[in-house]
Every structure is written in C-alpha cells, then in structure tokens.
C-alpha cells in the first residue's frame, strides 16, 4: 500500500494509464462501477476489464481522486503544465469518479473547441459516467453542450427539406436522437424520478427532433410500457404529458399554416424513384381525440391496478385538462399548473381558482364520465390513499366547472 507522496504519485499515474489502456483495448466499454475492496490484496492493477464492463477497486479511489483533482487545479491555476494527452487522460479519470466536477468538463470543452478532442468521445464518456451517476446534473449539461456543437456544424445539417413535407431529420440527426433516447432510458431506469434524464429527453425532442410529429408519436408509444412499470415516477409521466401537449400544439400549428396557405395541401410532384421515400417520410395524420381517449383508458387501467399512487391521479388531471381545452378549441399556451389545490396556501388557491375560471367550461359528457369513474373507485377501493386521491380529483373537477 502506498504511503509516501512519491509512492502515491507512482500508483496514481499507473492507474490513470491502466484506465487509458482499457479504453484503447476495448472502445465499446458500456458500464463502469466500483468493486468493493477495502485493501489491495494482490500486487496487480486495481482496474478490472471484463468484456464491456470496467471496474475500479474501491481501495484506490482515496488515492486516485484527490491526486487527479489537485493535478487539474494546478493546471488551471497555471502552476503545472499538462500536455493534451495528459489532460484528456486526467479529466477522463476524474469524471468517471466525480462527474459533477465542472472544471474538468470545461477543460474538455476547450479541447473540443480546439479540435483536439472528438466530441463523440465525450458523449461516450458522459454515457459511462451516467451508468454510475445517473442523476449527475453537470454531465447532462455538458452533454447538451456537446450536442449543440454537433448540430451547429455547417457540414452536418440536422434537417433536410423534402418538398411539401417540410423538414425531416437527417440520418445523422436520427442516429443521435436514438442514442440520446437510449441514454435517457437507461439513466431513468437506474434512478427513480430522474428529473435530469427526462428533462434532457425533452430537450432532445425540442432541439434535435424539432418536435417532429412522427418522433413524438414513437416516443408516446415506446414509453407506455415503461410508465406502466414505474407508476410512481412523476418525471416519467410528466414526459408523457409533454408529448401529448406537443402533439396538440404541432397539430394546431399545422392547421393554421394550411388555412393561411391552401396550396400547401396540394400534392407535390414526386419522381417515381422518390415515391417510396416520400411515403415513408410523410407525417402521420393524428386523431387527437382518439389519442387522448387511449391515454384515459391507460390511466384507468393503471389506477385500478395500482391503487394509492398520486402520480397516476396527477397524470389523469393533465389528460382531462388537455381534453377539456381540445374540445373547447382553446390554445394550449396557458401554464399547465393542474397538480392540485393547496389548502394550506390561500393565495395559491385563489390564483388557481382564478386561472381555472378563465378556461372554457368542460363538456358535460366528459365531466360526467369522470365523476362516474370516481364513484366507481370510491365504491370499490379499500385503500385509504386511493380514496383520498379520488376525492381530491373530484374536488378539482368541481372547481374546474364552476
């Protein structure tokens, strides 16, 4: 075991080199982790590489982390010089152990801007860090910065024009979107209600996918099973609410464009060889009422199957809110603050009541069906929390219709 500063320096340099060599031997490493090992029992490297998994024996972290941390700070204060390769290796090791060290990410930003570091490699490093620290805010922030650099490259446009079909994601953009969705999904599975992961997923839809309708529909479909397996995950259900609201907003925008420019609805002349491609890229037609009805049925099944989960009742409020505005033909630019009335805050209650009264009166049929659903739940449930949430939902509906 190393004791003197010289021995620690030799040990750490060897470990950093072993980590670098591990990535060179296997560039497809997809997960990192700590191996519980209080002491160094054998005279061997504490870095273990098995297939695509990289492990670090825990005994060396107390030497490794302070050393690389101090080394980078000395570089930033111009008290010690590090060449580019050393910077890449030191920041890589540091971020795998502590991904919320902002200075290390900033150094790598400088390396990317100078052309020394491939931004794709930084996406991979961030993905690895998220397998151990799935909620790391600095990692998600840096990831968005890297993606912005990629989509801003003039030689790599994110979207291409397809005649009257508007713009669709390029193959490169589609690949990036798919990879980011996978990273977000893995992080959300590792940490419950991972707000940072779901927020990043929304950012990807807004900035990479440009709220493409087909991608929004695919996301709504692909996250349905996940939501049914994580019925207490507020962030996951908020994501579905974002998808539904975005689909409604995009449909409203498209309808308004069609009204202003009727020629847009005329079919474009497509060469025979491009007909198949045009069909495959044409935006699907959306039946919004049917889409929301399906979400109501999904909500009903979950509430019946998993009683006592507040997340499910909050989600149902949002669905009814969207149906309510869609049926009334109202714009969805208003804030969706429908998480309930806070009895302990009189001011909050007053503001919520005023906001709800500004909205159109909900259709009587939909409101009646919701009250029937609440009556059915209250008459059959034995769960105290379920009854409380159902009563709160009824109170919200009454306030909405006043």
Curated annotation (Swiss-Prot):
GO cellular component: cytoplasm; mitochondrion
InterPro entries per UniProt: Prenyl_trans_a (IPR002088)
PFTA repeat start-end pairs: 87-120, 122-155, 180-213, 219-252, 295-328
Protease among keywords: no
PROSITE patterns in UniProt: PFTA
Positions of region (Disordered): 263-282
Keyword annotations: Acetylation, Prenyltransferase, Repeat, Transferase
Record Pfam families: PPTA
GO molecular function: protein prenyltransferase activity
Keyword Lipid metabolism: no
Modified residue annotations for N-acetylalanine: 2
Family: Belongs to the protein prenyltransferase subunit alpha family.
PANTHER family reported in the protein's UniProt record: PROTEIN FARNESYLTRANSFERASE ALPHA SUBUNIT/RAB GERANYLGERANYL TRANSFERASE ALPHA SUBUNIT (PTHR11129), PROTEIN PRENYLTRANSFERASE ALPHA SUBUNIT REPEAT-CONTAINING PROTEIN 1 (PTHR11129:SF3)
Protein name, per record: Protein prenyltransferase alpha subunit repeat-containing protein 1
Native source species: Homo sapiens (Human)
Gene this protein is translated from: PTAR1
């Amino acid at each position: 075991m190393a004791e003197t500063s010289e021995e620690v320096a030799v040990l750490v340099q060897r470990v950093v080199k072993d980590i670098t060599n591990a990535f060179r031997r296997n560039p497809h490493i997809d997960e990192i982790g700590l191996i519980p090992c209080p002491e160094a029992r054998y005279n061997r490297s504490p870095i273990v590489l098995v297939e695509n998994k990289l492990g670090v024996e825990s005994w060396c972290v107390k030497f490794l982390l302070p050393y690389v941390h101090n080394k980078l700070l000395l570089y930033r204060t111009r008290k010690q010089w590090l060449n580019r390769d050393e910077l890449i290796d030191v920041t890589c090791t540091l971020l795998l152990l502590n991904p919320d060290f902002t200075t290390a990410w900033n150094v790598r930003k400088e390396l990317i801007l100078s052309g020394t570091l491939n931004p794709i490699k930084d996406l991979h490093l961030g993905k690895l860090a998220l397998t151990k620290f799935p909620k790391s805010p600095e990692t998600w922030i840096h990831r968005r910065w890297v993606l912005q650099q990629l989509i801003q490259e003039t030689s790599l446009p994110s979207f291409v024009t397809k005649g009257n079909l508007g713009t669709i994601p390029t193959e490169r953009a589609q690949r990036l979107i798919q990879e980011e969705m996978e990273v977000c999904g893995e992080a959300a599975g590792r940490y419950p209600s991972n707000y940072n992961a779901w927020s990043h997923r929304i950012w990807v839809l807004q900035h990479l996918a440009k709220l493409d309708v087909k991608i929004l529909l695919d996301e709504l479909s692909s996250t349905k099973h996940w939501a049914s397996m994580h019925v207490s995950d507020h962030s996951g259900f908020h994501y579905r609410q974002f998808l539904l609201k975005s689909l409604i907003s995009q449909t409203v925008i498209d309808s308004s464009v069609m009204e202003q420019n009727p020629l847009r609805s005329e079919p474009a002349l497509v060469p025979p060889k491009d007909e198949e491609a045009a069909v495959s890229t044409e935006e699907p037609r959306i039946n919004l009422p049917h889409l929301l009805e399906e979400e109501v049925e999904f909500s009903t099944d979950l509430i019946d199957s998993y009683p006592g989960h507040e997340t499910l009742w909050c989600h149902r409020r949002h669905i009814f809110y969207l149906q309510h505005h869609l049926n009334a033909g109202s714009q969805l630019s208003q804030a969706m603050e429908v998480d309930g009335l806070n009895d302990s805050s009189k001011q909050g209650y007053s503001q919520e009541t005023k906001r709800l009264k500004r909205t159109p009166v909900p259709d009587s049929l939909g409101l009646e069906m919701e009250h029937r659903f609440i009556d059915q739940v209250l008459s059959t449930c034995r769960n105290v929390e379920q009854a409380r949430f159902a009563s709160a939902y009824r109170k919200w509906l009454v306030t909405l219709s006043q």
